[in-house]
Structures are given as C-alpha cells and as structure tokens.
From Swiss-Prot:
It comes from the Bacteria. Pfam families: Ribosomal_L21p. This is Large ribosomal subunit protein bL21. InterPro entries: bL21-like, bL21-like_sf, Ribosomal_bL21, Ribosomal_bL21_CS. Part of the 50S ribosomal subunit. Contacts protein L20. PROSITE patterns: RIBOSOMAL_L21 (PS01169). Disulfide bonds: none annotated.
Length: 102
C-alpha cells in the first residue's frame, strides 16, 4: 500500500517504512507527525481524493532536523568592481513513515 501526501507545497509518494526528506516541520527528533493531506491511496483498494481523501492520514516519526548543502549565488557587474556573494542552506526534516491509515 502506498499514498501520495502533500506537505510543504510538494507531493510525495510514500510507503510504510520509507524515509523521506520534507520541508522543515516544527517538531523535534523522535516526535510523531501526522499528514492529513492525502491526495491518493493505492493498493488493493484505490482511493482518489477531491482534492483530499476523507478519513485518510499518514503517520510518521521525525528522525532528524538538518540543512542541505550550501548553494552559492554570485552576482557581478563587469567593469564596475561590484560583486555580491551569497550562500543559502535550506532546512529539511527527515521523516520515517510508520503507517498509512485509509
């Protein structure tokens, strides 16, 4: 059985026992999280939401909080001695899927 959930403005296809990286959630490592925005549940009994499946949820456990690799942006204007260097590290949350309730 698998499900498609929406979190952080993105859709993820998940199965029980799978670890996924999602946009930062306000939870600590070891906390339980529930995703209520389930768009699709597949398996023996397929359910399609309009836009979400009623009564369906996905439960998971937060493994860790972290930051991705640094992305460096560099802007310059030729012949003007003007340049700007900026870095960004996007925060993420690693979640292990425990159960799919449909």
């Amino acid at each position: 059985m698998y499900a498609i959930i929406v979190t952080g403005g993105k859709q993820y296809k998940v199965e029980a026992g799978q670890a996924i990286y999602v946009e930062k959630l306000d939870a600590q490592a070891g906390d339980k999280v529930t995703f209520d925005k389930v768009v699709f549940v597949g398996g023996d009994d397929t359910k399609i939401g309009t836009p979400f499946v009623d009564g369906a949820s996905v439960e998971g456990t937060v493994d860790k909080q972290g930051k991705e690799k640094k992305v460096v942006t560099f802007k310059y204007k030729p012949k003007k001695h003007t340049h700007t260097k900026q870095g960004h590290r996007q925060p993420y949350t690693k979640v292990t899927i425990d159960a799919i309730n449909a």
